A protein has these predicted regions:
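Conserved catalytic core of the tyrosine transesterase superfamily
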Residues: 1-271
Length: 271
């Protein structure tokens, strides 16, 4: 099977399993990246070469986080076990055990510095929604105007992680910025999607990440601060302001309460 045929079949395999749009595009994007790295038919890639890719290239050279390395590993497993129908020795390609640590959140001063450095109103609005409503980056690119409920001050999140739908809070600041962005900065094109690129195409995860890194450097923040850090700040704020774990779990779209409980250790509260 050629790599082109592999990608075509992999695409169909994911569609048959009803993967969310975010997962589908992430798997396809990183799948192409993996294929480009080896530069030969994936059927010819050895287990030792896969180990070297995961644990030397991704971990040592690129210094990716354990979560990111495991994501690549999951794609490799899907590629071989499902698409190529080829057994893979998982003991030789183990998932990295994630180190338990405290989520990084930003201080009020750091947040103020960061937002003051963002000189593009569209991206400032995007970052405010991540901070004020706790949306994942993939959920932001899928936002439609019809998802914004200004009467009940909430946002409908379609196709969240695991294809789950939910409602989350729409802050007054986010609503004001959305209205300003829509009326003054967004081009009048025929698309219900809120955020578009400069070419009037749907916004992508990659573009947002690149812009975030640019403004993070401009603000002088630690390189470990990511777009997802804004979501961590949102959850921590909820807990510090009296929200219950169940409420936070639903607003964040967590499938397991244990994910929500990790924010208790970050929040400035007495238990």
């Amino acid at each position: 099977m050629t790599n082109e045929q592999l990608l075509e079949k992999m695409s169909k395999d994911m569609q048959m399993r009803n993967f969310s749009k975010y997962t589908y595009y992430a798997y396809m994007h990183k799948g192409k990246e993996i294929i480009k790295y080896f530069n030969k038919p994936m059927e010819e890639v050895t287990t030792e070469e896969l180990r070297d890719f995961l644990f030397n290239y991704l971990t040592e050279e690129r210094k990716l986080a354990d979560r990111s390395v495991n994501y690549y590993n999951s794609i490799i497993r899907f590629m071989y076990e499902v698409t190529l129908d080829k057994l893979i020795n998982k003991k030789q390609l183990p998932m990295r055990k994630r180190k338990k640590g405290v989520y990084k959140v930003l201080t009020k001063e750091e947040l103020s510095t960061f937002f003051n450095c963002v000189d593009d109103y569209k991206f400032k609005t995007i970052f405010m929604i991540a901070y004020g409503s706790g949306l994942r980056i993939g959920e932001i690119v899928n936002l439609h105007m019809s998802d914004i409920d200004s009467k009940k001050m909430r946002i409908f999140v379609r196709e969240g992680k695991g294809n789950k739908e939910r409602y989350t809070i729409l802050s007054k600041t986010s609503l004001e910025m959305l209205r300003t962005y829509w009326s003054k900065y967004r081009k009048p094109v025929k698309s219900d999607k809120i955020f578009l690129t400069e070419l009037d195409e749907p916004m992508t995860v990659g573009v947002i990440r690149d812009r975030f890194r640019r403004y993070r450097r401009k603000a002088g923040l630690n390189e470990k601060v990511t777009m997802h850090t804004l979501r961590h700040c949102y959850a921590t704020n909820l807990i510090e302001n009296g929200a219950t774990l169940i409420q936070v779990k639903e607003l964040m779209g967590h499938s397991n309460i244990r994910s929500t409980m990790e924010y208790v250790h970050v929040a400035n509260i007495d238990l």
